Amino acid sequence: MTANPTSIHQRLDRRLSGFSLEQPFYTSPEVYALDLQHIFYKQWLYAVPVCQLAKAGSYTTLRVGAYEVVIVRSRDGEVRAFHNSCRHRGSLICKARQGQVAKLVCPYHQWTYELDGKLIWANDMGPDFDASKYGLKPVNLRNLDGLIYICLSDTPPDFQTFAQLARPYLEVHDLKDAKVAFTSTIIEKGNWKLVWENNRECYHCSSNHPALCRSFPLDPEVAGVQADGGVSKKLQAHFDRCEAAGTPAQFVLAGDGQYRLARMPLQEKALSYTMDGKAAVSRHLGRVAPPDAGTLLMFHYPSTWNHFLPDHSLTFRVMPISPTETEVTTTWLVHKDAVEGVDYDLKRLTEVWIATNDEDREIVETNQQGILSPAYVPGPYSPGQESGVMQFVDWYAASLERALAPRQVAAE
């Protein structure tokens, strides 16, 4: 179902607080285009862990809507991002998802770029051709303590405030000393907002995530912040114990709701996301104390949520690919010197979240199918169980409302 001529502003104005969005926000190509234009093309997006680009010439590619981006480590050690489009006639330069190169060479006419984006060879372009004017177009990039974020906008929003807040939480995890143990990419046949809504609550966990529930707590007093923003005594005691051991833990939320950090406890006696609750990696990534510090939960809308544990870390990247399809990439990080088969078993490390991701995929797809019905109308969220969903939807609605000023009407 496409959006009707009613303005998006009017749909947002009549949105009931505590209810899901109207159907076009989950189904309409026009609303999807607005989401890309005003959110994904303007906000800082998580891309990859920096350890994925370990050597000069290591690169990865990323598609954000219509944009193609290549991220590469240069010979000076800096990681840079460029539009993955040759300045000659526009061909993709790097076609693979990741790789290792000496130079960035366009496969079409062999225009050749240095790893810092400078054009260094273009055959037979005439005596007046100035190669210095045809370097690759840069993309804004920030390295947040081992996590690479990019922004496609020529006028990127502030990143420093988030970085200053997050850095002390991340520093104890030593992500600069990480390596990628495994990466999983799945396509969920659901709108990107449904993927986020599902992530932001555990109302569904007990009936859908048997493996995750072996370690992730369902007790509302320790599983999250209360609907009014308060913290239970149990949770505050956990925060205080971690802080006393030198590990930042307190709940912090951005003023506009875009990002949040909090170090949440796992099930009693659980140390990591494994079937038995024991550590998945014997050589720990980071200096987190105490051993049962739980998981640092960090999200940054619209592209990432993360779990940083005492023994390993997981990053999740959310990327919309159509109005009803979303790519979810999960990366497991371990210490760079951890040896598979000695310090960790790959199946044991990954099985909980591989199962959980697939269960979430089915949930999101079933949710999307029901929303496609003409009978769908917005329904109420649970204040006690789905306050996180309400927080995400409020952030999304406010972000789109601000971006669309002056008022804009969606096409039929």
UniProtKB/Swiss-Prot annotation:
The keyword ATP-binding does not apply. The keyword Acetylation does not apply. It catalyses: L-proline betaine + NADH + O2 + H(+) = N-methyl-L-proline + formaldehyde + NAD(+) + H2O; L-proline betaine + NADPH + O2 + H(+) = N-methyl-L-proline + formaldehyde + NADP(+) + H2O. It is an enzyme of class 1 (oxidoreductase). Its cofactor is [2Fe-2S] cluster; Fe cation. Homotrimer. The system is probably composed of an oxygenase subunit (Stc2) and two reductase subunits (Stc3 and Stc4). PANTHER family: CHOLINE MONOOXYGENASE, CHLOROPLASTIC. [2Fe-2S] cluster binds at C86, H88, C106, H109. Residues 45-150 form the Rieske domain. It comes from the Bacteria. This is Stachydrine N-demethylase. The gene is stc2. InterPro entries: Rieske_2Fe-2S (IPR017941), Rieske_2Fe-2S_sf (IPR036922), Ring-hydroxy_dOase_2Fe2S_BS (IPR015881), Ring_hydroxy_dOase_asu_C_dom (IPR015879), Rng_hydr_dOase-A (IPR001663).
